[in-house]
Structure formats: structure tokens, C-alpha cells
């Protein structure tokens, strides 16, 4: 049994953004949720998030999670922020885990190691990391596992600055925590209350303070846009490695972007520059071409999305293909062996087995029957200025190039629509519909007009 407090009240001025720092996205979800999910993995008895700057937005992001919220009205430092949780946890005996909402790489395994030290008798345990360049971090002084102190860089003599072990900002405490917090002073230039001051307070009360050295990568926090990009890069490398280990082929993996919510099957091939977002699910043997973007899209086994295609909320069945340069909007469903080619846009439409729309077409709010061919430049005119209307095209129909089907309208099975037609009435099964002005040839007109006759 333990309680976990996540500190998420900071303003994040160096981000230069109106969005609260902890809500900046990493691979499609707010940074704070990474810290929250790591905390939940250990099944805490109580989970408190301390919010402050932009707190209303932060609380919205926490909706649906089993958390309690404490408010830090004034941002007076990390120790002051933690003290705001006392009202919720006053009767909780401990131990307590404390992490930061802007440190999203911490693993449950590392947090468990901190908690174990306190359960084994330490009063306080803190996570440390050895950094190649510790500039800007407080240095850890210790003997063995015992922490003697934390020296801020500005106060450190040269021999202390040479130390590369730093405080990573994650802690475990025993039940003495809130009493100790009340002894923290703000005798510093910023007039703020800092968590590292608890090291000296715990030691003064005869309680052991131990260090747990973690992986340097996990200690990475986010205070700037550059650091945000660095952390996102770490998350991406982990995710790519995980999927390649499960049988996904990535060509130039460092160029591929994907989010944790994406699901991939073995023998999927991802070409350079592919972007996979949201609840995208890609089946076995599928291929995603260079610079294709898939969001909330399903590719069933054997489907292909070719270069520079954008698909949002689409569903491609086995053997279907789209692209290059196609656009599939929400509700686009391509059944088996459908092909949608270059510069074809499909929105809220069902294309049955074997439909071909090779180039330069718009199919919106339509249902197209099995085996039908859609010529170049075909448009389903679905919007009358007030409402959307449906176009229905039967099986094995042929819609000639540059035709416009003005919805609501139906073209029957095996019907033909002549090129360049504007269809405003239903076309019966097996009929030919031609709706265009008859061609006239005026002999000699051009020569006379140009004065060369």
C-alpha cells in the first residue's frame, strides 16, 4: 500500500506557450499522462495530482483517471507544491512516491526500486542519474547508498561541479513526509521551497536518505521545446525498437513517426517518412509507402497505402490499395481489391469489391457497387448548399471521365455514363446516359475567325 503524488503545477515559462507545460503532447498524448500511467502501473492506494498554472485544462486532461486533485494557487516551489496534498493525505500513513509531471520517461520498475528502499527502512529515497553533461543540475554527495546532501550548481565549488551524479527529481518518503515539509525554508534567491532540502531535514531527524541510481535517459525532464523534442525522440526510438522486435520492417526507421496507440502486425512494411497516428491498426503483410499519413485508420491484411497518401478514419479491406497521392477521409471504406489512385478523394463512402477509381476523382457520400469503374475526373456532387446527399452506383457500372453525378441520384447495375455528362436523374440498369451538348463542327470557322481563310 502506498500513495503517489505527481507535481504538475509549474508554469513552464521556457516553453513559451499558452498551453500548460505538462499538457504538451509527446507522441500524440499529453506529457502528464506518461507520468500518470507509470504511477498507475504500481496500483497506488491513493493518487494525487497537484495542479496550478492552467489547472482547469490539466484537470480536463485527467478526466476518466482515478486521481484526486490538489491545487497550488501560488507557484512557490516543489516542496510547497507537495505540501498542498496534505489535506488529502493527512491520515495516510505512507509510504509516498513523488514524481514530476514533466519527467515522462520514468519506468514503473524504477519507481518500484525507490519504494522498496523506504519499505526496507529508509526514511527517504531519491532517484539519481549520472549524466555526461550535468550542467544546470544539483550534484549529489553520498557515501555508498547514503545521501549526504544535494548541492545546487551555483553554490558548488569546482570539485563538486566535477561530480556527474545528479538529482533526477523522483522520491519515496516514509510517513514523516508532511511533518518534514513544514520545516523547509525559503532562504534562497527565488524565495521558494525546494524538495531537495528534505535531505538535510530527514538526516537531522536521524532518518536514512538513500540514493537509487537510475538510467540517465529516465532522468530527462522537459523545460524547453528542445528538451521536449529530445524526450519525444527517446520515446520514438523505444517504440520503433519494440515493433521491429515483433516483426515489423521499418526502412530508415529514424524517419518513421508512430504513436503508442498504433497497432502493427508482423510483416508490416513501413517506408521512410511514414506517419501513423491515433487508433491506426495495420494487419499482417500490409505496406505503408513513403510519406503516407494514417490516422485512426484500419488496414486489413494485405492492404497497401502508397506514397504521399493521407488517410483519416478510413478502413481498407484485404487487397485494397490507395495512392499514390490519394486522400481518404473519415468514413471511407474500401472493400477487397478496391483501388483508389492518384489524386482521388473518398469521403464517407463505401466502395464494394473490385471498384477502380484510378485518378482525379471525388467520391463523397457515395456507395459504389462491385466491379464498377470510375473514370478520371468523376465527381459526386453531394452538397446542395444546405445538406449532403447520397450517390448510389450499382455493380459493374462504368462512369465516364469528367462526369458529374448530382446527388441524390442512382446509377443502376451495368449502366454506362458517357464522358463529360452531368447526371441529375437516375440511370436505369443497363442503360447509357449521356447528358451533354451534341458536338457541332463549323467548317472553316477557325480560319475565318483568325483571318487566315
Swiss-Prot record:
Show the segment(s) annotated as Linker.
226-246
**Where does the chain bind acetyl-CoA?**
376, 382-383, 401, 419, 436
| Descriptive protein name | Bifunctional protein GlmU
Catalytic residues, chain numbering: 359
Enzyme kind, highest EC tier: transferase
Region N-acetyltransferase: what ranges?
A: 247-453
Q: Which Pfam families match?
A: Hexapep, NTP_transf_3
User: What are the binding positions for Mg(2+) in this chain?
Assistant: 102, 223
Reaction catalysed by this enzyme: alpha-D-glucosamine 1-phosphate + acetyl-CoA = N-acetyl-alpha-D-glucosamine 1-phosphate + CoA + H(+); N-acetyl-alpha-D-glucosamine 1-phosphate + UTP + H(+) = UDP-N-acetyl-alpha-D-glucosamine + diphosphate
Concerning its family, UniProt says: In the N-terminal section; belongs to the N-acetylglucosamine-1-phosphate uridyltransferase family.
Q: What is its main location?
A: cytoplasm
Amino acid at each position: 500500500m502506498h500513495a503517489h503524488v505527481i507535481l504538475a503545477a509549474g508554469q513552464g515559462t521556457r516553453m513559451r506557450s499558452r498551453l500548460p507545460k505538462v499538457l504538451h503532447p509527446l507522441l500524440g498524448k499529453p506529457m502528464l499522462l506518461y507520468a500518470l500511467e507509470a504511477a498507475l502501473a504500481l496500483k497506488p492506494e491513493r493518487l494525487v495530482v497537484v495542479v496550478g498554472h492552467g489547472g482547469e485544462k490539466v484537470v480536463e486532461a485527467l478526466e476518466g483517471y482515478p486521481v484526486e486533485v490538489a491545487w497550488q494557487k501560488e507557484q512557490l516551489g516543489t516542496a510547497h507544491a507537495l505540501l498542498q496534498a496534505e489535506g488529502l493525505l493527512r491520515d495516510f500513513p505512507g509510504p509516498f512516491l513523488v514524481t514530476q509531471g514533466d519527467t515522462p520517461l520514468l519506468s514503473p520498475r524504477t519507481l518500484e526500486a525507490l519504494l522498496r528502499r523506504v519499505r526496507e527502512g529508509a526514511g527517504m529515497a531519491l532517484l539519481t542519474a549520472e549524466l555526461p553533461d550535468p550542467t544546470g543540475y544539483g550534484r549529489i554527495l553520498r557515501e555508498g547508498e547514503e545521501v549526504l546532501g544535494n548541492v545546487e550548481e551555483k553554490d558548488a565549488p569546482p570539485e563538486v561541479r566535477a561530480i556527474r551524479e545528479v538529482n533526477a527529481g523522483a522520491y519515496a518518503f516514509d510517513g514523516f513526509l508532511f511533518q518534514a515539509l513544514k520545516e523547509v525554508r525559503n532562504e534562497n534567491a527565488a524565495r521558494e521551497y525546494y524538495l531537495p532540502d528534505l535531505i538535510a531535514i530527514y538526516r537531522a531527524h536521524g532518518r536514512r536518505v538513500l540514493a537509487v541510481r537510475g538510467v540517465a535517459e529516465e532522468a530527462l525532464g522537459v523545460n524547453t521545446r528542445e528538451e521536449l523534442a529530445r524526450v519525444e525522440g527517446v520515446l520514438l526510438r523505444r517504440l520503433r525498437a519494440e515493433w521491429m522486435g515483433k516483426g515489423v520492417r521499418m526502412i530508415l526507421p529514424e524517419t518513421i513517426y508512430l504513436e503508442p496507440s498504433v497497432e502493427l502486425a508482423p510483416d508490416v512494411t513501413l517506408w521512410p517518412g511514414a506517419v501513423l497516428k491515433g487508433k491506426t491498426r495495420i494487419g499482417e503483410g500490409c505496406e505503408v509507402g513513403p510519406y503516407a499519413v494514417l490516422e485512426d485508420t484500419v488496414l486489413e491484411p494485405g492492404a497497401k497505402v502508397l506514397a504521399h497518401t493521407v488517410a483519416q478514419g478510413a478502413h481498407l479491406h484485404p487487397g485494397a490499395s490507395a495512392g499514390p497521392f490519394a486522400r481518404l477521409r473519415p468514413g471511407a471504406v474500401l472493400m477487397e481489391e478496391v483501388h483508389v489512385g492518384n489524386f482521388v478523394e473518398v469521403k464517407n463512402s463505401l466502395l464494394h469489391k473490385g471498384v477502380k477509381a484510378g485518378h482525379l476523382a471525388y467520391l463523397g457520400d457515395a456507395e459504389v457497387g462491385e466491379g464498377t469503374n470510375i473514370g478520371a475526373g468523376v465527381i459526386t456532387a453531394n452538397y446542395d448548399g444546405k445538406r449532403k446527399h447520397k450517390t448510389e452506383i450499382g455493380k459493374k457500372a462504368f462512369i465516364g471521365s469528367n462526369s458529374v453525378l448530382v446527388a441524390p441520384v442512382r446509377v443502376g447495375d451495368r449502366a454506362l455514363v458517357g464522358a463529360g455528362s452531368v447526371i441529375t436523374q437516375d440511370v436505369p440498369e443497363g442503360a447509357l446516359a449521356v447528358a451533354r451538348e451534341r458536338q457541332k463542327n463549323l467548317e472553316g470557322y477557325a480560319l475565318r475567325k483568325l483571318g487566315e481563310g
